[in-house]
Structures are given as structure tokens and as C-alpha cells.
Amino acid sequence: MTKFIFVTGGVVSSLGKGIAAASLGSLLEARGLKVSMLKMDPYINVDPGTMSPLQHGEVFVTDDGAETDLDLGHYERFVQRNFTKRNSFSTGQVYEKVIRNERRGDYLGGTVQVIPHITDEIKHRIKLAAAGADVALVEVGGTVGDIESLPFLEAIRQLGVEVGRDRAMFMHLTLLPYIAVAGEVKTKPTQHSVKELRSIGIQPDILICRSERPLEESEKRKIALFTNVEEKAVINSLDARTIYEVPRMLHEQGLDRLVTDRFRIDAPVADLSDWDDVVQAQLNPEKSVEIAMVGKYVDLTEAYKSLIEALIHGGIQTKTQVNIHYIDSEDLEKDGIGSIEKMDAILVPGGFGERGVEGKIAAIQFARENNVPYLGICLGMQMAVVEFARHVAGLPSAHSTELDPKTKTPVVALITEWTDENGQLVERDEKADLGGTMRLGGQSCALVEGSKMRDIYGEDVIRERHRHRYEVNDGYIAKLEAAGLKISGRSEDGNLVETVEIEDHPWFVACQFHPEFTSTPRNGHPLFKAFVEAASQHKQTTH
């Protein structure tokens, strides 16, 4: 039967619960166990799909099309399996389902309450996500003490009682602030955080204590005494040089052993040689490259979390230190392209809305005209098509209908609207073959033989994840191709453009999908590996 590890956080947010949970998941997986992971978010939004990246960070897309919290990305990068929409849910989804049940009369006229109706729905969803796993790690978003988290904490308390101590553990992540003036670590915030947790009926079995410096044994004893946690279960999580050191750090303090002993699981010792290889490659590069990421959310780099990690993975695969320069595309509009002129490669990521778009187009034009390696993703591909149409294909008014609904040259348009070769608007409703207005999740793409993309992937048909409403307009493809833009990949039905490249450019590649969502530190991703290699080659030939 599935065992449960409930992961909570205290003192402050952004301590790294997701990394800690994912690291423990990877340790248990390395012991031969089947692991499932679940993130429960206490916000009332149904999902993060409509939330500003500057508030929430990245929206991670699963293969089955769920728009989820960025922690799902950590889970997939650390645990070698794809998760689904069952592995992430929010307060909004729970309330939506309970209210829908009430409207149908499922509660037989009873008063609908947080307990038991909301908590029962939460427990039901936890069990669905855990189905078939040996161990399920369940992360509660937010911080203990937040009013929004209370229904989730009550639900995991109940579930812990229902399955019993032999099948449930509680792991609490806290901060131990170091006061430089006093020269000591303060344990009081952790004591109060655990006290808050115990007041609602949850006694932590494991404490993960984040700190800047190693804990003394006396400090561990003090924490154990005041929190009623075994001393051996007080785990010190230091600031790591790379997040991929964390599994080894936690393993050396016996975290996975605590779990297997508690659950009476007879499992082999974890082999972490693959993690050691990753860390060794990342911390001991043989060369370096400078890559400009030109976007509109650069004030919060969490908005590009998977993309940043994918570039790091490309560096790991090629023994290259990837130095990412975050360039605000609006600054390029105001100040010119001076900040990207000495870069070894340029990347324009996905995004929505017109703000900063002309800066992205300027960066793309610079990359194209100066033979700088370029990778465009989602909006980065659409703007590459717009730039090429304007400056090469003789279509100076080219634009996307997302950004200029009245454009006379819509080289990029909503999936449900197309301009044919005669300039006539073709409209399809959401029930037509092209689907709805948002294309989400894994889709197959057929690559053209002899193209750079085909060479990079080494496969005729690939599967990548999408999140977009707009596509390259088929009505302009003949003119774009005649000017030198190569359509190197299409959806398997041939209707939608998936990848483009410029044949007479050393390395100019763009894709409609998001390859960063399938990159992992141990296996990397062929597109990011090739991009980093191209940046390194450009550096060698120009500097």
C-alpha cells in the first residue's frame, strides 16, 4: 500500500520545499521505489495559467496539458517520470468541484462546509495522485500559519490518522537564521513554527533546517528537544553550490534511511553516481559562453525557471559554464542593442502581450544579420517569423494578430483564424480540427529530412509540450520560404508550423513548443545541448 510523506514549510516562504521534496523523491527512486509527487497550492485561482509570471513565476506544462506550479518542473527534473494534471491542484479547483457537486445535489441538501466537504475532496485528490506508487510525497504550498493553507493542513492531518503511522510521515522545512552580530544560529523561529503545526494536530517526524552554516550537534539537540523530533531526524540543509548537490547532501545525513526504516521498506542503498556526475560536470566546466535571454519578465527569473535549468543542462552535457544575461526587451527598445552585441548566443523565450515585443524583434534582427546563434521559443519563434517577414521577405507591415489585431499582414494569427492566399479570412470554431484557442501539452511534430532540427534530434517524429494560442499563418509560408525561411517541422497532420530555421545562417533555429519542459539534468535535451555548442563555436570563431 502507498506510503505518504507530507511536506510543509514554516518561518518564511521560498525556502525550497519543492527542491527538498524532489530530492527525497529522487533518493527513494534510487532505492528502487516507485515515487509519486503532488503539489497543493492554496491560492483560489483555478490554475496559474492566467496569473502574471511576475507574481507566480513560471507556469509549468505537463505532457497531458495541465498548467501547473513550477515545482512540478523540479519534480520531473529530479524524479525520472512525467507527472500529470492529477499531480497538482489548487484551492480554486477544490472549491469549484465541491460547489459543482452541491449544485447537482450530491450532498443531499446538507450544509456544505470546509470540514468535511472541502477536506474530503482534498484527500480524494491526494489519493488519486498517489495511486500505484510505493511512496507519495505531498507538498503543501505556502507557509504554516497562513490562513489559506488551513484546509490542506487539516486534510493531511486527517489522512495521516486514517492510514496510520506505518504509512504516513510529516516532514517540515524551516529556516534557521544566522545572526552575524551574535555569531549564532537562532532556533526560536523553528520552535514557533513547529508549535504552530502541533497546535493543529500535526507532529513533524523530520525537520529540514535551512541554514547558511553547518549546525553544531548542540544546536541539533536543542532543536530536537524543543520540537519533539528525534535528533537524527533533524536534517541540516545548507545553501548548496548547485541544487543538484541536494540529493547527496540529504542522503549523507540519512534522510532516505529515516523514511525506509519508518515504513519498514527493505530497499537497496541508493546509487547516486549519476547525481555525482551531474554535479562534477556543472562545477568543473572546461569552457564558458555568454547567452543573452531577451524577455519581458526578467525582473523575476523564476518566470523562466525551466528554461534556465535547461540551459544549465546544456552546459552540463557539453562541460560548459553557461552565463545567462537577462536582458529586458523594453530596454532594447529604449537604449538600443548595445547590451547584446558581445553575446555568444541570443535566446528569446515565450511570453504573452505586446509589451517589449519590438525589443525582441530588434534582438532577433541582430542575431540574424550578424550570424549570432539564435534560439526562439514559442513567442520567440513567432517574432522570428515577423522579423524575417519584415526585413527579408518584403512584408514591412508583418505582425501577429495577438499584438496588432488590425495588421494587414498577419503572418502569425490565432489558431482559429487564418488568411488564405487570396487575402480572405478563414475562420474555424473551437470544435474544428485545429482545436481550441489554447494548445496545451505534448504534441507530435514531424521534422523535415536534412533540416538542422532533424539533425539535432536524430528522429523523424518528436514529442514536445505546447502552450500557445497563435501560430504561423499558412497563407504566407510560400513567400517566407521563397525568401529563405525553412519550415523544418510541422504537426503530424501537417496543418501547423512547429519549427523554422534559416538555411544560410550558421545556427538560427526556432520552435513553437517549449523544449525546456522536458530537459533534465541527467539526460539534458538535444536542442539545448546543440544551442550551447553553437554558442561555444561562435565564441571560438569571433573572439
UniProtKB/Swiss-Prot annotation:
Q: How is its activity regulated?
A: Allosterically activated by GTP, when glutamine is the substrate; GTP has no effect on the reaction when ammonia is the substrate. The allosteric effector GTP functions by stabilizing the protein conformation that binds the tetrahedral intermediate(s) formed during glutamine hydrolysis. Inhibited by the product CTP, via allosteric rather than competitive inhibition.
Q: Name one GO biological process term.
A: 'de novo' CTP biosynthetic process
**Binding of UTP, residues:** 13, 186-191, 222
- What is the name listed in the Swiss-Prot or TrEMBL entry for this protein? CTP synthase
Residue sites binding Mg(2+) per the record: 71, 139
What Gene Ontology molecular function terms does this protein carry? ATP binding; CTP synthase activity; glutaminase activity; identical protein binding; metal ion binding
This protein's gene is called pyrG
Active-site residues, as the UniProt record annotates them: 378, 514, 516
**What are the annotated GO cellular component locations?**
cytosol
* Subunit record text: Homotetramer.
User: Which organism does this record belong to?
Assistant: Hydrogenovibrio crunogenus (strain DSM 25203 / XCL-2)
